[in-house]
């Protein structure tokens, strides 16, 4: 069985080509276009060529005088060609800016605006191979369905063939768009064309619809842009127009109609044009804003160095009788009348700060960071020839000689039955030896930091009724054999002691006379006695729990009762 297809009427009918071009144009602009194409795609020329496709009959399902249904294998490699026109983006960066987040792209103005140029594309050497299902009826036209992708290859020629990158990009994009067009849009186009060719009723109906659309377009009232003119309209010379002059204008008026724009918009358009021409970022000014570059320099350029001043630390303490007293130890200045602040914190300052005592410098004295400090140490212990005691005494005195105190702020506390005497040999403290010292260090009892915080100094007035020398003579002398000396191992580690809070009004000063040293020794003795009485009163008030914590007799252990 053979079939004869007449291909010449399709190639010779001009009306058919015109209608086919309109349908192809609508189909190409219907689908989403790539971002590089900035205008509509127009089918400029369509030619089916003189070579018809080759059809191989695989199956015939229905055959009658006015209908036909069958499956064919189609192969086409003719001389048909198609020419398209559009406008594309000349900036190659624009394609990448749309596919990436905005914060990752610099978005330069010259590249983001871009330049659109015309593009002409010619599709030729089209090769098709597919299995198609053909259903023909005079009343319903021709229906053609592709069972697979028909496009094998085609040749794409454009105005950018000299640039390999653009040529390859256009080849890939057009092939992808053409495959979608043949699978989805081409069967519908062929069906409508067949209805127009074989069905006169459909042709008359389609002509009537086209005439109505043209009439509607012709009768459409144009929108007058001057119905609501801008508020600050100006003419070509920049003169502001009033309402009467604007009302006299019309769409077909004088030659100055094109210049009737808002003055603000003209300034913005001019700034935008300048930014494209000069690559200016055109940063607008911000009202009521202070930029950092405008602010004066806040760096203080001072000549010389500033001595760091240590603030005086003071801590008020109140007794049980709701009495508030502040105790302050202050350093005395040197012989030249100018005090000095140590450049770094000493061990005594650290210990005093943690226990609440205040070691501040002279308020009102000047600071001399380059002057060497003079340290003075008061030796209050009895001379002794034992070298072990010398090592223990030097450990205590060296910590006191750092911050230039007149009286050691930390008094070592010892049991009453173990008096300690200082060495009789020469001990070098980098200070002035102030003569003889008292025979015995006043006894004191150790106190915990918690007891110092809770207990306050009671209001006790001590007045010496006899001279200090008489009291010193009445003291019993201890035997040298009864004294206990420290070993070098014990003297290397200073046990933690709590400094005493001396009564209000006591002031220590360094003098070179023996009477001043004895007076200081008597004051220290009285302070130790006050601390001992305070500790005894505290121990008596605490009761059972304090006794058990101090190591007294513990309650008897549990013993089961004998049956």
From Swiss-Prot:
Stretches with biased composition (Polar residues): 303-332, 346-357, 458-471, 478-488
Compartment list: Mitochondrion outer membrane
Stretch list, region Disordered: 298-499, 531-563
Transmembrane regions listed in the UniProt entry: none
Entry-linked CDD domains: SMP_Mdm34
Ranges of Basic and acidic residues composition bias in the record: 531-540
Gene Ontology MF: a single term: lipid binding
Keywords: Lipid transport, Lipid-binding, Membrane, Mitochondrion, Mitochondrion outer membrane, Transmembrane, Transmembrane beta strand, Transport
Residue ranges of every copy of the SMP-LTD domain listed in the record: 1-195
Compositionally biased tracts (Basic residues): 365-383
A cellular component annotation (GO) from this entry: ERMES complex
Biased composition (Low complexity): 386-407
InterPro entries: Mdm34 (IPR027536), SMP_LBD (IPR031468)
Coiled coil region boundaries: none
One GO term (biological process): mitochondrion-endoplasmic reticulum membrane tethering
Subunit organization: Component of the ER-mitochondria encounter structure (ERMES) or MDM complex, composed of MMM1, MDM10, MDM12 and MDM34.
Family: Belongs to the MDM34 family.
Annotated domain remarks: Lacks alpha-helical transmembrane segments, suggesting that it resides in the membrane via beta-sheet conformations similar to those predicted for other outer membrane proteins and porin.
Protein's name according to its UniProt entry: Mitochondrial distribution and morphology protein 34
Natural source organism: Botryotinia fuckeliana (strain B05.10)
């Amino acid at each position: 069985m053979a079939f004869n297809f007449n291909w010449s009427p399709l190639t010779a009918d001009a009306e058919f080509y015109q209608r086919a071009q309109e349908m192809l144009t609508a189909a190409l602009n219907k689908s989403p276009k790539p971002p590089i194409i900035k205008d509509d795609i127009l089918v400029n020329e369509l030619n089916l060529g003189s070579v018809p496709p080759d059809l191989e009959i695989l199956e015939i399902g229905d055959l009658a005088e006015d209908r036909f249904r069958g499956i064919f294998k189609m192969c086409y490699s003719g001389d048909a060609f198609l020419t398209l026109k559009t406008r594309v983006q000349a900036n190659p960066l624009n394609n990448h800016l749309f596919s990436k987040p905005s914060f990752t792209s610099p978005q330069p103005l010259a590249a983001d605006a871009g330049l659109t140029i015309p593009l002409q594309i010619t599709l030729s050497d089209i090769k098709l191979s597919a299995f198609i299902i053909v259903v023909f009826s005079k009343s319903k036209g021709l229906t053609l369905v592709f069972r697979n992708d028909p496009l094998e290859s085609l040749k794409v020629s454009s105005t950018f063939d000299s640039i390999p990158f653009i040529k390859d990009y256009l080849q890939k994009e057009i092939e992808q768009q053409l495959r979608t067009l043949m699978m989805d849009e081409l069967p519908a186009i062929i069906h409508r064309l067949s209805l127009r060719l074989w069905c006169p009723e459909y042709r008359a109906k389609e002509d009537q619809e086209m005439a109505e659309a043209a009439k509607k377009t012709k009768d459409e009232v144009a929108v007058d842009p001057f119905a609501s003119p801008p508020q600050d309209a100006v003419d070509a010379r920049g003169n502001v127009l009033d309402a009467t002059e604007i009302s006299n204008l019309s769409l077909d008026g004088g030659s100055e109609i094109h210049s009737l724009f808002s003055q603000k918009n003209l300034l913005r358009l001019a700034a935008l044009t300048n930014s494209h021409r000069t690559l200016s970022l055109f940063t607008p000014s911000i009202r009521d804003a202070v930029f950092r570059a405008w602010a004066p320099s806040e760096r203080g350029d001072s000549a010389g160095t500033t001595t760091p001043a240590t603030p005086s630390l003071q801590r008020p303490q109140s007794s049980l009788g709701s009495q508030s007293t502040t105790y302050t130890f202050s350093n005395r200045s040197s012989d030249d009348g100018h005090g000095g602040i140590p450049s770094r914190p000493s061990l005594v300052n650290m210990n005093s700060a943690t226990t609440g005592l205040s070691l501040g410098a002279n308020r009102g004295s000047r600071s001399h960071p380059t002057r060497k400090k003079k340290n003075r140490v008061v030796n209050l212990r009895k001379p002794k020839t034992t070298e072990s005691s010398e090592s223990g005494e030097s450990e205590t005195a060296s910590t006191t000689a750092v911050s230039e105190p007149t009286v050691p702020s930390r008094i070592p506390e010892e049991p009453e039955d173990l008096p300690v005497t200082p060495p009789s040999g020469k001990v070098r403290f980098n200070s002035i030896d102030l003569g003889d010292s008292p025979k015995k260090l006043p006894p004191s009892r150790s106190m915990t930091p918690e007891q110092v915080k809770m207990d306050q100094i009671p209001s006790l007035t001590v007045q010496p009724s006899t001279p200090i020398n008489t009291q010193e003579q009445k003291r019993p002398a201890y035997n040298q054999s009864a004294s206990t000396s420290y070993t070098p191992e014990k003297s290397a580690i200073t046990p933690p002691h709590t400094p005493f809070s001396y009564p209000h009004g006591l002031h220590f000063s360094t003098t070179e006379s023996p009477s001043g040293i004895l007076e200081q020794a008597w004051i220290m003795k009285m302070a130790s006695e006050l601390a001992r009485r305070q500790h005894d009163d505290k121990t008596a008030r605490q009761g059972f729990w304090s006794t058990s914590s101090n190591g007294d007799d513990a309650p008897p252990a549990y013993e089961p009762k004998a049956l």
